[in-house]
């Protein structure tokens, strides 16, 4: 059971509780303005008009999407497109958000904006965020719980403090801590 539902028995309702952003796959239609993609997603998820407009206005403000809404996805920079992808994944107000490498390839300003937005989304809307990343700064900024996986094995399941307690030396970075864990497990 997830969120009180059996996923394979209540697939349609279950999917409405999930938002997904994959770095290499887009839910935005490449040659149409972002707003057109959003309106199609509104119809797919059967979002009531008032809720859609309210959510779109909120996301547009928080992610600074104003001038981007009338631009085709193919004309956006990577950072702009990622912000639009994140908004697309949240239009239907999911309870769970899967983010795969949400800051990969982004400049420093865009990374900070995306991280700040994810934190706010989690805090204000109680959205559960499942994040996969190789960016240790993402982990440090966003993670309450860390699962470290290597070659299909669970190496660590704990808090960020638990991860940091494995420091090979006092001033070790998260990259160095994880590299040491991988060495310890011969990964």
Question: Locations of the language-model features?
Answer:
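A short, surface-exposed alpha-helical micro-motif characterized by mixed small hydrophobic
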Residues: 139-141
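Helical segment within the ABC ATPase nucleotide-binding domain
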Residues: 112-124
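ABC ATPase "signature
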Residues: 157-158
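A short, proline-enriched helix->beta-strand linker immediately N-terminal to the Walker B motif
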Residues: 91-95
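Conserved ABC ATPase "signature" region
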Residues: 39, 43, 50-68
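Conserved ABC ATPase signature
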Residues: 72-76
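Catalytic Walker B motif of ABC-type/P-loop ATPase nucleotide-binding domains
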Residues: 97-100
């Amino acid at each position: 059971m997830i969120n009180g539902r059996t996923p394979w028995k209540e697939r349609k309702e279950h999917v409405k509780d999930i938002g997904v952003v994959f770095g290499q796959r887009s839910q935005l239609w490449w040659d149409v303005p972002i707003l057109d993609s959003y309106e199609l997603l509104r119809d797919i998820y059967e979002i009531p008009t008032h809720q859609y407009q309210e959510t779109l206005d909120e996301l547009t403000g928080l992610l600074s999407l104003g001038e981007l809404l009338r631009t085709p996805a193919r004309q956006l920079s990577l950072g702009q497109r990622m912000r639009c992808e994140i908004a697309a994944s949240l239009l239907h107000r999911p309870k769970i958000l899967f983010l795969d490498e949400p800051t990969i390839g982004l400049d420093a300003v865009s990374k900070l904006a995306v991280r700040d937005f994810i934190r706010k989304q989690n805090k204000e809307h109680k959205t559960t965020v499942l994040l996969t990343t190789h960016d240790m700064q993402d982990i440090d900024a966003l993670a309450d719980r860390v699962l470290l996986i290597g070659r299909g094995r669970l190496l660590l399941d704990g808090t960020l403090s638990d991860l940091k307690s494995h420091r090979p030396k006092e001033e070790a970075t998260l990259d160095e801590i994880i590299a040491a864990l991988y060495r310890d497990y011969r990964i």
